[in-house]
């Protein structure tokens, strides 16, 4: 019984987070003009990693807004935790520090443990922000695949749509939530070489496909008008 309650708390987030969400959601939605597509794809429970393209420093806030049933936690570069206002904000969002100067084994272990405990973790496979750039032309890092396979977690692909892949206040932001990818569908083979790179490529391909599918639907809608 206690385990079930803890898992639910991990999914929903702390009481403080839920209060902050209730207070700020309307403000965030107004400033960023967020529209969520595929909200029905958000799972009610289960361990999973959210993987998205990365356009702006506001992306974690936008994704947290889109996922109503879960608190999406993030790894953030440790330098951000020394900036007073930013540090407070990202801590509310459930972020924890990572040293991007090398392989931060401790941060990876913490991320894996968090997912195993039922927390929802958000990762940007690109590793950096790429505004005004087609995400398919960017490089990716293997952190999402590494954490997902070690935690045996499902993947939730997400694509953030902004005009010209550029963030501006009061410009519409679409968050497209794709269908859950079960861990078994990743076909992870711990004995095979290059598995993390392969899985990362497959995950990010599905992420980008969400954006392309959304663009195609928008184009068809305009033609019919």
Where are these regions (language model features)?
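Generic non-transmembrane alpha-helix signal with a bias for helix starts/N-cap capping motifs
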Residues: 20, 83, 107-108, 141
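Short gly/ser/thr-rich secondary-structure transition/capping motifs
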Residues: 29-37, 102-105, 158-159
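Short, basic, glycine/proline-bearing loop/turn elements
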Residues: 24, 92-98, 127-131
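Catalytic core of membrane glycerolipid acyltransferases/transacylases, capturing the structured
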Residues: 42-102, 110
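Non-catalytic C-terminal accessory region of glycerolipid acyltransferases
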Residues: 2-12, 108-225
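A generic structural signal for well-ordered alpha-helical segments
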Residues: 27-29, 67, 90, 114, ...
């Amino acid at each position: 019984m206690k385990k079930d309650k803890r898992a639910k708390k991990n999914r929903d987030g702390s009481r403080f987070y839920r209060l902050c969400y209730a207070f700020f959601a309307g403000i965030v939605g107004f400033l960023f003009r967020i529209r969520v597509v595929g909200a029905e794809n958000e799972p009610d429970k289960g361990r999973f990693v959210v993987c998205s393209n990365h356009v702006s420093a506001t992306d974690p806030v936008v994704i947290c807004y889109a996922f109503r049933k879960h608190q999406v936690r993030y790894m953030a570069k440790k330098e951000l935790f020394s900036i007073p206002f930013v540090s407070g904000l990202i801590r509310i969002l459930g972020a924890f520090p990572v040293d991007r100067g090398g392989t931060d084994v401790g941060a990876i272990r913490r991320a894996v443990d968090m997912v195993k405990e039922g927390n929802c973790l958000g990762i940007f496979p690109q590793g950096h922000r790429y505004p005004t750039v087609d995400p398919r032309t960017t490089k990716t890092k293997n952190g999402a695949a590494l954490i997902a396979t070690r935690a045996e977690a499902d993947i939730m692909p997400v694509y953030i749509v902004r005009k010209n892949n550029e963030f501006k206040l009061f410009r519409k932001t679409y968050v497209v939530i794709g269908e859950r990818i079960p861990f078994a569908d990743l076909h992870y083979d711990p004995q095979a070489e290059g598995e993390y790179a392969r899985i990362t490529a497959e995950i990010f391909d599905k992420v980008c496909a969400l954006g392309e599918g959304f663009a195609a639907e928008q184009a068809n809608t305009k033609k019919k008008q």
